Amino acid sequence: MQRTYCPRCGGKLEKRMHEGRERDWCPACRVMHYDNPVPATAAVVLDHRLDLLLVRRGQEPGRGKWCLPGGFQETGETPEQCMLRELAEETGLQGRIRGLVGLEMGQNPFAGEVLVAGYCVDAVGGALCAGDDATEAGYFPLERLPELAFRSHARIIERAAAPLRPRRRFRGLPGGAYVVTSLDHLAVAREACRGGARIVQYREKDAPAAQRLATARAIAAVCRESGTVFLVNDQLDIAALSGADGVHVGQDDVPVEEARELLGPGKIIGVSCTSLEQALEAERRGADYLGVGAVIATPTKEEYPVVGLEGLRRICRAVAVPVAAIGGINLQNAAAVKESGAKYLAMVREFQEDAAARVAAVNTIYKK
């Protein structure tokens, strides 16, 4: 900010070099004045599809362009209070702060240098409606954002989007083989990745926790090297500690929302379903994909009702998220299961031997 007179005594200021910068100096009261950035906040609000909430600015700077909800911090309020107030004023939404994304510097032609604190915020109430100096409010895919008003906001978005890569990458994953490990889990995972598996799920319930974690970490490393999605069955702690891309849970396990709360917004969450009702509910709760089965009677899923190809077809038509079919699938019936709408074919026994070749065979079905 440009100053002419001393705010202490009213005397005329002079420019002096001090500590490597040109600063305002008052010769009357012999005080050096320092410029400090103005504090502001910005909210990163994502919906269950990972679309980002933006508002269109109704005034300068950046009038007509889009930005994150936020604004300048007022005296007497904390940055967190400022963030929630601005979110409510500009979008009509009530928020709950998940955490700090980071701090970025920006320039404002009226306020000078601005220190922007970006927060990840969950929308927990209210109705979306533009207000205050925002003329519009809406959600946008991270891959197709409109022109942004502030570079500081763009950098905050980049920071917030980085941990979301597993879920974002999962959206573009091609269909094919979904390998559920058994027996020698690491060996199966290695062969699965060598054959081009789309997804590897580590399912082990009987080994000691320390052994399960060590195995999961080893599989995670193999999957990272090959670019294969790695999930852990049921165990959120093992998934988090091993660096897995996500977790697969059953109907009686931790709900999707709580799993998301524990693992963070970037992890993939799949849910087992045996009926259309369960599938629709899991999708509503924010599941990234559905594991549907048993499609055909199988000894590894004896406690599950048989969904059948027609039941699988109904579910695939009713939901927007991808479906992984499981239960009784082998290379002989894989094509028929794929034709029912399943994006992934999940198998256990079929991949216990010659996993690489059988994975490649399944993927070939999806290329036809």
Language-model region placement:
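Conserved N-terminal beta-strand and adjoining loop/helix that marks the start
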Residues: 28-52, 72, 103
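Catalytic cores of alpha/beta
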Residues: 230-245, 274-286, 318, 324-325, ...
